[in-house]
Structure formats: structure tokens, C-alpha cells
């Protein structure tokens, strides 16, 4: 799904199942929720579409007049439902920042792929429309994954902020309700703070600056290429490294990326942006312990001081 969205921002794509790999109405629905504006043109197969980035959703958490401090935990790529998912490692890091029934961080940001999803190409939208038994089988898999994660997260009363990854979109491609929407309902029914943004990229205003969280569409594996740097260059070229909220500009100072499955922190001095890749909770990929604590304060010149 995400690579198809990325492809459609670069060139027109025929609006057919064969070319998109998914049902056109689902593709357009997801594109709209992710802040894209479709531009349609005639094509020999009917209609083609090219996506224009209209806006990235912006969420105000708190501005500099409320606090110039920040204190949050970055996570991504839990992959609950994967045979090698490590629930003990997830509980370990959540409990580290939770003492005596109180969180030690203001927010927990999770940048997609909370669930393993459906990783086989066997299922299709049409199949599930026509075959109730197969549809129920996929729904059961989704519900098992959702409930497994629910049983972990509900123990820790954090303020969770989460987005989709490519694995969650696997369910939407099949025409099913977004699993993280279901998880949000279940968490809130238990009185927990859990906010799901039905997109793969969202901006948060924190202490007078912007934190951009996204699940990378794809990444370049060539030696010497840092995928997050490459993405920042594209952001800079296509609109700048700042966001506007209610007429006020906020510089991007934090950039959290999911999808890469390796833990890394990078500070880019040229843009003054801290990049975090929180790692994966798949046992065979945990060279370094996943999760990154981001704590400090913002100076008057919008520079970041990490503690």
C-alpha cells in the first residue's frame, strides 16, 4: 500500500486493480485519509491518478507557552502476531517508564506495524467478499493480534499516539476495519488514553516545535544511503522542514521513523533535526534493545537540548 502511494506521487498510475494491486476505492480512501489529493486524467484503461500531497495532519499537543520541556518514548514495529515477536521485551521497556501506577513519560509514540497483519498474498478483497469462511478466518487473526496487544498495553496507563504501518494496511486492503481503530475502542472502553491516527504520517506540535512521525513508504538499501536523510531531503525540497498550524510556523525538530527495523539515533546538524528509528520487537532483529527515550527542553531559538 505505502509503496503504491509513493509511486503515485511520482507518476500517474492507472486506476485499476491490476496496476494498483488493490481495489481503487480503497486506494483512494486511504490516500485521502493520509492527506493526498488525487488528480485524475484520462487513460487508455479508463482513468489514471496522480497523488498530490495536500497536507500532513497536524496535532497540537502543547505549545511553548505551556512548556518548553519534552519527555516521550518512541517505539515502532512491534509486530504482535509475528512468530518471533517478543512480548517480554515490550513489557520490559514499558515497565521501565512506569512506576507506582504512574507514567514517567508524557507520551508513547508508536510509528506503525504494531501488528503483524496478514503477510500472505493468498487473500484478496474479492475472495473475502465472496467467501464468508475465509473472511471470518482473517477477521479472527486480526482480533487475536488486537487482543494480544491490548492485554499488554492496558497494564500501563500511558498516553499512546499511534499510526498505521504497511502491515496494518494489509487488513484495510482486504476491505476490513482498521485494526488499530478496534484497539482504540477497546482501550478507551477500559478508560485508557489511546489515540489512533488513520494515516502513516502525522505532525505533532510539542513545546513550540514539530515532531513528525511516519512509517517510511520504502527505503534505499544502497551502501552509504541513510533512508531517513533521504526522506528529509525530499521534505525540504517539497515544502520545507516546517509546518504551519493556525497561521503559525513550527520547525521540525524531531523525526521518528518506523519500518526500518533497526535502532538508531542521528542528529542532523544541517537541519537541527533529531532522527529516531526505534527498532523492532522481532527477536531475531534486536541487535540493540528497541525503544528510544527522548527528553529535554527547547531553547528560545528553537534549538533542542537533549537530557
Name these PLM-found stretches:
Residues 194-204:
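Short acidic low-complexity segments
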Residues 210-212, 219-307:
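Conserved beta-sheet core of the metallophosphoesterase superfamily
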Residues 74-77, 106-113, 160-166, 195-197, ...:
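Active-site neighborhood of phospho(di)ester-bond hydrolases with catalytic His/Asp-centered motifs
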Residues 1-74, 79:
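Acidic, histidine-bearing metal-coordination/catalytic regions of metal-dependent phosphoesterases
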Residues 184-191, 205, 212, 217:
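Extended, solvent-exposed, turn-rich assembly/linker loops in the middle of proteins
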Residues 61, 85-196:
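Core catalytic region of metal-dependent phosphoesterases/phosphodiesterases
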Residues 60-73, 203-213, 269-273:
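Beta-strand-turn-beta hairpins that frame and shape the catalytic cleft
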Amino acid at each position: 500500500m505505502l509503496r503504491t502511494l509513493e509511486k503515485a506521487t511520482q507518476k500517474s498510475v492507472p486506476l485499476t486493480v491490476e496496476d494498483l494491486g488493490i481495489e481503487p476505492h480503497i486506494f483512494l480512501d486511504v490516500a485521502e485519509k493520509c492527506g493526498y489529493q488525487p488528480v485524475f486524467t484520462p487513460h487508455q484503461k479508463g482513468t489514471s491518478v496522480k497523488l498530490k500531497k495536500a497536507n500532513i495532519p497536524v496535532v497540537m499537543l502543547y505549545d511553548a507557552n505551556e512548556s518548553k520541556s519534552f519527555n516521550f518514548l518512541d517505539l515502532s514495529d512491534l509486530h504482535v502476531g509475528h512468530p518471533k515477536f517478543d512480548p517480554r521485551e515490550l513489557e520490559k521497556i514499558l515497565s521501565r517508564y512506569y512506576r507506582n501506577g504512574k507514567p514517567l513519560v508524557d507520551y508513547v509514540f508508536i510509528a506503525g506495524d504494531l501488528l503483524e497483519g496478514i503477510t500472505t498474498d493468498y487473500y484478496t478483497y474479492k475472495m473475502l467478499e465472496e467467501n464468508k469462511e475465509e473472511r471470518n478466518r482473517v477477521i479472527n487473526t486480526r482480533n487475536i493480534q488486537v487482543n494480544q496487544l491490548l492485554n499488554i498495553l492496558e497494564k500501563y496507563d500511558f498516553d499512546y499516539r499511534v499510526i498505521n504501518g504497511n502491515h496494518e494496511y494489509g487488513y484495510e486492503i482486504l476491505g476490513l476495519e482498521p485494526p488499530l481503530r478496534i484497539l482504540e475502542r477497546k482501550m478507551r472502553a477500559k478508560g485508557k488514553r489511546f489515540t489512533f491516527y488513520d494515516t502513516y504520517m502525522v505532525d505533532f506540535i510539542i513545546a513550540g516545535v514539530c515532531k513528525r512521525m511516519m512509517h517510511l513508504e520504502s527505503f534505499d538499501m544502497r551502501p552509504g544511503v541513510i533512508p531517513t536523510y533521504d526522506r528529509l531531503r525530499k521534505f525540504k525540497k517539497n515544502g520545507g522542514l516546517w509546518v504551519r498550524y493556525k497561521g503559525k510556523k513550527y520547525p521540525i525538530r524531531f523525526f521518528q521513523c518506523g519500518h526500518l527495523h533497526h535502532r538508531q539515533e542521528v542528529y542532523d546538524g544541517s537541519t537541527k533535526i533529531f532522527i529516531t528509528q526505534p527498532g523492532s520487537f522481532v527477536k531475531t532483529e534486536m541487535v540493540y534493545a528497541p525503544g528510544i527515550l527522548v527528553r529535554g527542553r527547547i531553547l528560545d531559538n528553537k534549538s533542542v537540548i537533549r537530557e
